[in-house]
Regions:
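Internal nucleotide-binding/catalytic subdomain
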Residues: 127-269
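Active-site "cap" helix and flanking loop/linker of ATP-utilizing ligase/carboxylase catalytic domains
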Residues: 223-247, 263-337, 347-348
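ATP-binding N-terminal substructure of ATP-dependent carboxylate-amine bond-forming enzymes
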Residues: 1-66
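Generic C-terminus detector
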Residues: 346-349, 353-414
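A conserved helix-loop-beta module that forms one wall/lid of the active-site cleft
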Residues: 55, 62-125
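Short acidic-hydrophobic, aromatic-tinged amphipathic segments that line or gate anion-handling sites
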Residues: 14-26, 92-98, 129, 134
């Protein structure tokens, strides 16, 4: 790991502080420790080919190869894959690599669109017309910035039709053929309350005890899972077998779930929701993914609701205050019945300091979302510093508004 994360350092028998994109050093360390099973967490190392390096070294790995991980690392590859295989849930899109083609694509799709650099941007490169970009000139200016600066590592943009509905996440364990879905989760990308402000990697998330969401029906959940299975099958047909955790982000529309994106890994923060509820042995699940032997009975979850809220540095989403000490009373948080997960922080001489990314995730578990949310809020009182939290996540008023909005969409013009 790059940062000295106190949670990981405390849990692991050994760890190496290294750039996680350095495939050679990570593989050498894994071999020196006789590692018997590997899981690659972040998307950057997947793009760098870390899974491939581990597999080549003879280490079973429950994460996709560089080729299969393109469903996340290349938005153009993902969209074209869905189009080639006629996967349900695909949307209208255009792929462009210069300003003239971008303007032509805008003329074709109209201004109700989303602008995405094709490569990895940590969830912060997506711009929605009407929210982040107000005019055609704004879109062209942002496009020129992407092309000239190679934002996301490539001078290419995917222009997508803007979807109307509620976003949701379904994650699944995959072994190349079988898809074992987890409870649905809803993340909140915007930095500020009321879903305002810049996009972030995710400020918090929640799940219900029935594995659904307040606005999501069982048939709609099943339809989204079917899409994920079709994507796994499509990758296999193109000799890019997918073994590992898959993250599907969907927009629930009046016509059912539509694909926003796929991640070749767990979602962050959504992993904290589902793994906090997992009753089964996670290491056994990973073994079975790596060995192509996963089945539905391998993953059993508590029938509980969960809420996660992220503590982030002041300025996160625009210009984070890095290097600031935050005080975390772990014992008091445990007494409140909450779980604590350190994220992108550095520990030095027993003190915890912020980086430019998210700092600490706090999770509450209960029979109902509102009770889990209250647990998190009590625990948050025991974390202090120059920090920011979205306190509105999973509040009853917010959830009621989402249900009402989805009902209006379903009942609207067909």
């Amino acid at each position: 790991m790059k940062n000295n994360n106190p949670g990981i350092a405390r849990t692991a028998k050994g760890h190496l502080l290294v750039d996680e994109h350095d495939v050679r050093k990570v593989v050498e360390y894994a071999r020196s420790k006789a590692v018997e099973l590997a899981v690659v967490g972040p998307e950057g190392p997947l793009e760098a080919g870390l899974s491939d390096g581990l597999i080549k070294a003879g280490i079973p790995t429950a994460s996709p190869t560089q080729s299969a991980a393109r469903i996340e690392t290349s938005k153009s590859f993902m969209r074209n894959l869905l189009h080639r295989h006629k996967v349900k849930g695909t949307i209208r899109y255009k792929i462009v690599d210069n300003s003239r083609d971008l303007e032509a694509a805008l003329d074709d799709l109209g201004m109700s669109v989303v602008v995405k650099p094709t490569g990895l941007t940590g969830g912060k490169g997506v711009k929605v017309v009407g929210e982040h970009l107000m005019t055609k000139q704004d879109v062209l200016a942002y496009g020129e910035e992407v092309f000239s600066k190679r934002i996301g590592g490539s001078a290419q943009i995917v222009l997508e039709e803007k979807l109307v509905g509620e976003e949701l996440t379904i994650q699944a364990f995959c072994d190349g053929s079988t898809v074992v879905p987890m409870p649905a989760v809803q993340d909140h990308k915007r930095a500020y309350e009321g879903d305002k402000g810049p996009n972030t990697g995710g400020m918090g998330s929640y799940s219900q005890k029935d594995g659904l969401l307040p606005f999501l029906t069982r048939p709609e959940y099943d339809a989204a899972v079917k899409i994920m299975g079709d994507v796994i099958a499509a990758l296999k047909k193109e000799n890019a077998e997918y073994r590992g955790t898959m993250y599907g982000q969907f927009m629930l529309t009046k016509d059912g779930p539509r694909v926003i994106e796929f991640n070749a890994r767990f979602g962050d923060p959504e992993a904290m929701n589902v793994l906090s509820l997992l009753k089964s042995d996670f290491s056994k699940i990973c073994e079975r993914m790596a060995d192509r032997k996963i089945s539905q009975k391998d993953a059993v979850f508590l029938e509980k609701a969960s809420v996660c809220k992220y503590v982030v540095p002041e300025g996160y989403g625009t210009k984070s205050l890095a290097g600031e000490e935050i005080k975390v009373d772990e014992k008091a948080i445990a007494r409140e019945g909450a779980l604590l997960y350190y994220a992108s922080v550095n520990e030095n001489d027993g003190r915890v300091y912020t980086t430019t990314s998210r700092s600490v995730g706090v999770v509450g578990i209960s029979d109902h979302v509102d009770a889990a949310e209250r647990t998190v809020e009590r625990a948050l009182r025991h974390i202090s510093g120059k920090i920011h939290v979205r306190h509105d996540i999973a509040k009853k008023d917010m959830l009621d508004a989402k249900v009402a909005r989805m009902n209006r969409i379903r009942e609207g013009p067909q």
